[in-house]
UniProtKB/Swiss-Prot annotation:
This is GTPase Der. Residues 4-167, 175-351 form the EngA-type G domain. Associates with the 50S ribosomal subunit. Keywords: GTP-binding, Nucleotide-binding, Repeat, Ribosome biogenesis. Transmembrane segments: none annotated. GTPase that plays an essential role in the late steps of ribosome biogenesis. The gene is der.
Amino acid sequence: MSAPIVAIVGRPNVGKSTIFNRMAGERIAIVEDMPGVTRDRLYAPAEWLNYEFRMIDTGGIEIGDAPFLAEIRGQVELAINEADVIVMVVSGREGLTEADEVVARMLYKSDKPVVLAVNKVDNPEMRHDVYDFYALGLGDPFPVSGSHGLGLGDLLDEIVKHFPDEAAEQEDDAIRFSIIGRPNVGKSSIVNAMLGEKRVIVSDIEGTTRDAIDTRFVTEEGDEFVMVDTAGMRKRGKIYENTEKYSVMRAMKAIDDSNVILMVIDAEAGIREQDKHVAGFAHEAGRAMIIVVNKWDAIEKNDRTMSDFENLIREEFKFLDYAPIVFVSAKTGQRLDRLPQMVKDVDDNHRKRITSSTLNDVIMDAIAINPTPSDNGRRLRVYYATQVATQPPTFVIFVNDVELMHFSYERFLENKIRESFDFTGTPIKLIVRARK
């Protein structure tokens, strides 16, 4: 059975993200005193009393005509539909508000267990402030302080009471992949088109996707994936707004937490320097890579358009010569059905292991074709090679003198390894060591 899901809902600035972060044990959600900052659902694992579960932090529900109001409402409704338990957060400091009553009315219709958390009860003298919230009709209010961690144990005790009895620890074999790229290249639209569910708010405002959101799905073939849609990463030296700066930090963490990276390029805008910076970070992290050219439907084409664009990509992204390229349209759905299988294939290659005997046969055949270089009368001698790691595949080559291994010859050996084994989509690392 999959882990139970707990949705944290409520109007803006009652401290949902603070409680979320306390339960998750790290700063997952963006926390800022600006209504509407937590605009998309955030997912994070948590554990209490040997129960593992997943939490969803939603954008707040607010009365008024704010630009994101209708979409945020929709996000909360989706979270409610997915949750096993709902935690409604209110503010003991501000007291009961009309917006709280609106949220409660939404929850009446959910037929899901609801636990009422009165946040910002930062000292015992404030505990009497919780009684007004009985008027919401959601049962006993639990006084907590997200900022100080007070009362969260009692709250978690109540939450896990509502979990199905079968809830148990599960090992996660899903393939994790991130979708990265500059703002407005269509990352969120690709997510929505692939999932068939409006899981991420999409608008034409740069930076709408403010944080990384984990989304689990299973294909018809039974392959399980966790997709992480990240905020558009800006160049690190040009980040001024606090929220955006933190989003970039989270995006980098999402890359670290992923097996495979989908690098999205805007076909209309072409390739920019920032695309190369973003791709470079993922490459340096050693992740498997796929280059996704989005908005291909908007390009006027002839019989050479695709090959010309592919050549441009290969020229601009020389360090990603191993990455397959796919031309898609999130708007029309063109070729999006290929992405899950491509992700699985490059992940398999990322995890691939080659036996030492087979590897050494390839190395020795390569040396027979192109003998090792020499310097000042001393010739490089290659003794043997072995694979020492996967993700990415990493090989150690033992030689007589590391200084004799020219970069060009190391590249030659890497190419021969790639020719012999399918490492499409994954970087490979060669480590040259002197045999003692």
